[in-house]
Amino acid sequence: MEYPTESPKPKITRKTVIFPIIGLAAFFLYIYIFQVDMLSIIAKAQTADPVLYALAVAFSLIEVFFFSVSWRVLAKFLMIKMSVMKSYLLVWYSVFVDTLVPAESVSGEALRVYMITREQGKETCGRAVASLVTHRILGMVMNVVVLILGMVLFFTGTQIDPLIFNLVLLLSIGITVTLLLLILFSFKEKWSLKVINWVVRAGNFLSRGRWHRKLIKIKEDAINIAKSFHDSMKEFKNNPQPLVFSLFYLAVMWGFSLSVPYLVFLSLGQQVSWSVILITATIVLAVKSIPIGIFEVGIPEITMTALYTVLLEPTLGPEAAAGISITATILTRLITLWLRFGIGFAAQQWLELKTVIAPADNVPVEKA
């Protein structure tokens, strides 16, 4: 069996175009409903300090770097060969796919699994999945920690809105439950085998036996991948050192991530509490991490603007809070969405170009 040399490049379809348009329309509808003066928003954005804003851009690039290094630590422990630069480019590629393809919280990860498997052979698939699942688990741990830290800081400074408190509490419980289920499933190999058997039986039933041979081959491959995945998770359990290093890099990443909106507010001449940044960032990220559909254009802007407005209203007043919140949100998303989308596209083109010009003997081939 020969592995394909072309990756499943994300194609521009009707859905990939219409979803961002709907999201942007929803955001501007939100602005219209609350009668926000867009001219004053634009005028305020033009006064942003270019040095501080450029620093926010640099911090965003460094944030992605530490995210990729954090994942690479886990992949390297599982004997997946990958340079620091390669992991950085793969993460940028996944950012591009995450933005373009619905269910963004898993599409980029699936892309990274495919790229590793394509280049290093099918036997690395289970290990690649294990590295990404473990990285997601560590990321969820950091989400809960930062969310709680934001609440503590906010409580020490002012009285928090009951709606925000209930939302933070609900998300903390939801993330924790999901985290525990994910950890439990990662170490229950029998559960994975039962799911595989159920899917194969369902496929046989729906196809009335026409896909029997193909399903048997798929079942064999899936079982091998599942065993490799669970063996890799056991390796992490027996040697937690890479988990510690990965978590450390994630903590550094969070520092740069939170600094981006903070610097954007500073560039607009507005000092804000770190608790406002922590709570808003973790709520947006927590909702984005749920693989239920699109959450990349429109909805994050609405969420960020609403949270900033509610959290800043006690100190700035409703009108000023709304104005600065929308301006900061737009400038932040120019960095964390559109700039990253462009860089991700460049990374995708570079990686695919390297694949095309690579010698044929570098392509892994498995004899049937």
Which ranges hold each PLM region?
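Transmembrane helical segments that form the transport core of multi-pass membrane transport proteins
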Residues: K227, S232-I283, P291
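Membrane-embedded helical hairpins/re-entrant loop segments and their flanking transmembrane helices
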Residues: S68-Y93, V264-T280, M304
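Transmembrane helix-bundle signature of multi-pass secondary active exporters and lipid flippases
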Residues: A281-G293, T332-T336
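Transmembrane helix-loop-helix hairpins in multi-pass inner-membrane proteins
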Residues: M1-A43, V97-W211, V297-A368
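Alpha-helical segments in transporter systems
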Residues: P10, L55-E63, H135, Q241-M253
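Membrane-interface helix starts
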Residues: R14-I18, T47-L55, K234-F248
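Transmembrane helix boundary and interhelical junction motifs in multipass membrane proteins
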Residues: F65-W71, A103-R112, V260, S275, ...
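Short, membrane-interfacial amphipathic segments enriched in basic
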Residues: G121, F205-F229
